[in-house]
Structure formats: C-alpha cells, structure tokens
Amino acid sequence: MKIFREVFELGNKEIVLETGGMARQADGSVTVSCGNNVVLVTTVVKKSVAAGADFFPLSVHYLEKTYAAGKIPGGFLRREGRPSEEQILISRLIDRSIRPSFPDGFFNEIQIVATVLSYDGSFSPDMLALIGASASLAISGAPYDDIIAGVRVGYTNGKYILNPNKEELKESDLDLVVSGTDDAILMVESEANSLPESVMLGGILYAHKHLKTIINSISKLAKVSSKPRIEYTIYQINKLLKSQIKSHFFGEIKNAYTIPSKQERNIKLNELRKNVLEHIFTSDVDGNEYSEKEVLEAFHDIEKDLVRSNILEGKPRIDGRCTETIRPINVKIGVLPGVHGSALFTRGETQALVVTTLGSDRDAQLVESLDGIEKSRYMLHYNFPPYSVGECGMVGMAPKRREIGHANLAKRATQAVFPNEEAYPYVVRIVSEILESNGSSSMATVCGSSLSMMDAGVPIAEPVAGIAMGLIKDGAKYAVLSDILGDEDHLGDMDFKVAGTRYGVTALQMDIKIKGISREILEQAFEQARTGRLHILGIMNEVIREHKESVSDVAPQIHIMNVNPAKIKDVVGRGGSVVKGIVEKTGAQIDTSDSGEVKIFAKDKRSLDLAKSMVEEIVAEVEEGQIYKGKIVKLLDSGAFVNLLGSQDGYLPFSEIEQAGMKTNSLVEGQGLEVLVQNIDRGGRVKLSLVAR
C-alpha cells in the first residue's frame, strides 16, 4: 500500500492531502486534513454513458458523521438520518464549483462523496471537502484538466482574512467563498453586512490569487498518483443537421424570438419543433439517420446562437429590452387578510407571494449539527410549484436541493437587516410561494421577504432588494445583462445574483460557465447591479419604506418584563403550579429565566393584558405606608398572618386589631382585611396595623 502526500499552507494553517490509504476501490480517494479535522472525499466515474443520456449526471454528497465530533446521534435509531439542509447546501456549493471544469458533451456519470471523519469545531469542514473533491477528481482518470480550488475569506477592520476560523467569522463583516481555476473565477457565494461593491470585488480577487497554492499541490499529487485517463466520447451537435434546420426554419425561429410573452413564445417554438421533426423525418435527406434527441439538440443550438448574437450585435433582448432595462415591477402589501404580514412582488413574468408569520421562542427551529443543537429565530422557506412555469408535476413533496439553495440565498440576503433578540423577541418564519417564474425567482423572494416583514411590523434595519445579472461573451465582445430572463440564464455565460440595501451588498451568488471574465467585466456587472438594485428599492419604497409601528390585529402579542430575580420562584410556584394557572386562565405562553426575565406570548391583546396583570400582582413589592386589601392565611395566639401580594405576607398583632376596635375572637382564616404596612425590617418581615372601618 503506497501512500502519497502533499502539504501546503493556507491562512497560517497546514493542510495535508493524502491518497492511497483509504477507499482504494474508488477511482479517486483523498483525505484532506487540517489540525484535528479530517474529510475523506471519493470519486467514482462510470466508464460508459447511459443509454439516451443527454446531460452530465454529476452528483455530489457531503455527509457529516456525528462520531467525527465525539457524539451519538439523537432520535430513536441513534444513527444519522437524511442530510441536513446545511449538508445539502455544501453539496451544492461543491457541485457548482467543479461542474464547469468538465468538457461540454461529457455525459458519463460521476459521483463524489465527501465524508467528515474528524471535527474539532474550529472551522467549517466545507472548504476541506471542496479541495478534496477537486483532488479526488484530479487522480480519478476523469477528463478534469482544469483543476479548481476554493477558499473562504472574511473581512474585519478593513482587512481581508484568508481561511478564517469560526471565532474570526463571528466578528467578520463578510463570509465569502470563491472557487476557480488558476486563471478563472467559476463560483462565488457570500453573505455581507451591507458592504460596498468595491470591497466585495476586492474580496473576490483576493481569494482568487490564493487558489494557485492549492491547485499546485493538487497537480503535484495527481502527477504521482493519478489513474490513466478513461476513454470517453463527447456528444457533439451534428453540423449538417443544424445547417438543414437553419436553412428551412431560421426565419421562423427568429420571428419567434421577437415574441415578448414567454407563454406565447413557447407555444410558437413548440410548434416549430414539431414542424422541424416532421420535416427531417419525412425529407429525402437521410432523415432516418437522426434521432429525435439529435434534431432537438441542433434546434436548441440554433436558438442559442440567435439569442446570443442578437445581444452582442446590440439588438433588443428576447422581451424587447436593452441590456440595462429592468422589467416592469408591481408591489402590493397586506394582500392576505388573515396572516401576520404579506407581499406580492411581480417583476415581468416572475411573481412571488411572500408571507411572514410571527411566533414565540418555542417556535424557533432547532438545528442539529456537529457543533450541537442551535436555535434559529429566523426561517425562510421557498416553494417552486410546477404551475409557476405552466407544467404538471409532483406537489407537496420534500423541498428539492434547488429550493433549499434559493431559500438559503434569500435568507442570507436579509439576515444582515434582521433585528437581534433583544430588539425584537419574536421568532419569524417567511414562506415564498413562487406563483410565476421567468428568471430570478430567488431575487423576487428577497424583495418580497423585505416587504412582507415590514408589513408584519418586523423592525428590519433597511429594505433589501435583489437582482440577477447575466453575461453574453464571444471573444472580446461582451454584454452584461440586467434582470435576466430564464432563457438568458440558460443560454448565457454567467448567473450573477446581487442583493443588498441602499448602502451596500448583503448577499452575492455567482456562477460562471466560461473562462476569461476580466476585472473590467466584474466591475461593470457590480455597477449595473447596484443601479438596478437602487431602482427596485425606489419602487418598493413608494409602497412601504419602513416597518409598520405595530403588528397586525391577528398577530400574536409579546411583552417582556424584568422583575426581581428572587420573585421568579413566586411566578413559577411549587411544581410550576402558579405559572400553569396563569396559562390555563389566559391562554398565554409564559417563559421565565433565573435572570428575572418574564416573557409573555399571547394570541391577542386581551389575553396578554390579563396575563401581564396577574404576573405584576405576583411580583409586586409591598411598600411602607401603603394600604392593602389582604386575606388572613394563618391565626396564631398573638396575631394573624395576612397575605398582601402574591406570596408576600405581613404580621398583624392582636394588639393592633383591638386598638382598631375589633374583637380578635371574631377573626377566621380566609377573612378579608384592610391593613396598613407600618414597617419592613431588614429581614424583609412586614408589620401591619388594621385600618379602622
């Protein structure tokens, strides 16, 4: 068993790549270690293409094992279940990073599995998994010539931090992940505290220059340990077939792409596809030599060439816009009467109905990870039903990876403006229902989430808007597109989503399909995105600029009281008897803490006010010189104990009763008396006198 190792430094941390010791039956197997963190990444490449395959079946699975952190899983079975959302997001991040490095037309199935074997909690293992995925591919024999790498960058006190640990990330205004090759940026994912575009671009370029060290180490490992290159075929468009279709149908295809409506355009294009298939299969020019798949691929290639050339030649885009024009926007809030907050955001043929629901601390999401169980006060869920694109399909199933990814992007975009628990004690859940989609539904979700929260009275720091940018590039000619359509995303070279406030960027996601994206192009894309974002914010601000001062009448009410910590036991009572009684009588939820905080959560104001008054009565302090209506709770030989407030009793001597002209033998337990607090000694003992009738 021969083991090969490569060692390099990244951000003052030593990282070790090793192959040959584990999982040797996989085509590629690499362990990536940093301190006590170890990730095993395997790659398996199928040597033949599945019959009828017309896409690249790459799958990436990032898995965390609880034993890596010295823990036993929860649940009845005490074993790991399906991957968490965080694991799915890391799988997507790795997939998006490596997918562009494969040649077009390569359809062999590849499966990558990254397994966290050891974890010390100092930093997320996601970058180790990404580096390991690239290394295992490089030695697997797959056609993976453009080796990629990825790094995380933070930004604190005006300085970029390479490969920050978790403590550094907590203080950072930026969490940026960049992956790419030696000479190209391929993927960017980030969250930021409203940072200027110049800082975001600087972070991307700073990250890219540090990829070379990792790529060199992976290349060295591949040179000494790589398997022979597999034999494979590349699917290519039949040029003769493409020429045939173009000569007969190009004019009609061209006319179809002047129809601005997506539905009408698709009807025309589907009709053309049928006509093309009929023409090819009934013509005398060897039509039977071609499959339906080949014909439709050639047709699609003509569409792609047409859309791209039109844009590069300065002609109108598919829907008639120029490169910088934003589609018409319509904003409505409060569209659903029975919810806590709602907004309907429509941009062209993309529409998101976004609903905000307020809850108590008990509604917070509990997220289990290698770090333990964490509580999330802010949840955002994204649903993409098939009717949003005019299709039939599965409904009511678990969210797909794409839905989880879009929800996460929208959450990260609005996280920077979400209030902390001290300022806003509610738990918030946002649901985005995509009702129509023709590009950039995730950015519509960002805009709708901001509007919906303001409608619900959530005190967000600033409104947030998002926009998706695109790129068409051919040699030195290029065009940056604002607010891209679905077809422009599919046929273009870049998907660049930017969200932020009027002050700066809060989230960024970029996927680039080609090499050669210069700094000049990135600067233009950032500037166009900023202009577009401010335009969208302006329209949103015309409808609602700041959060509503109060929550909806149908929304729950929260009140927080800070009382003497010694009184908490009185609020709770023996075995929780007192607090249970308040809950049963008012219907409110009551949470207490040893610090003296009492949090009341009620379905309406009446319930809240009643619970509040009951708690206030329990925790109220008696004062000297004040008169109280009390009740005798115990009779002694020399006097009576009278309950004043909650659990506070005072002692009433018989001499005081007689002095007030009342006979002591007439007193019974449970009898009401009006008493005056004469004094309270240092021990807290209360002496009373009877108020004469």
From Swiss-Prot:
PROSITE patterns, A to Z: KH_TYPE_1, S1
Enzyme class label: transferase
Enzyme Commission number, as recorded: 2.7.7.8
Catalysed reaction equations from the record: RNA(n+1) + phosphate = RNA(n) + a ribonucleoside 5'-diphosphate
Main location: cytoplasm
Keyword Transferase included in the entry's annotation: yes
Keywords: Cytoplasm, Magnesium, Metal-binding, Nucleotidyltransferase, RNA-binding, Transferase
Binding site for Mg(2+): D489, D495
Cofactors named for this entry: Mg(2+)
Protein origin, superkingdom: Bacteria
Molecular function as annotated in GO: 3'-5'-RNA exonuclease activity; magnesium ion binding; polyribonucleotide nucleotidyltransferase activity; RNA binding
GO cellular component terms, semicolon-separated: cytosol
GO biological process: mRNA catabolic process; RNA processing
Boundaries of every KH domain copy: 556-615
Location in or out of the cell: Cytoplasm
InterPro entries associated with the record: ExoRNase_PH_dom1, ExoRNase_PH_dom2, ExoRNase_PH_dom2_sf, KH_dom, KH_dom_type_1, KH_dom_type_1_sf, NA-bd_OB-fold, PNPase
Location of the S1 motif domain: 625-693
Family membership: Belongs to the polyribonucleotide nucleotidyltransferase family.
Role played: Involved in mRNA degradation. Catalyzes the phosphorolysis of single-stranded polyribonucleotides processively in the 3'- to 5'-direction.
Subunit structure: Component of the RNA degradosome, which is a multiprotein complex involved in RNA processing and mRNA degradation.
Name of the protein this chain belongs to: Polyribonucleotide nucleotidyltransferase
Source organism: Francisella philomiragia subsp. philomiragia (strain ATCC 25017 / CCUG 19701 / FSC 153 / O#319-036)
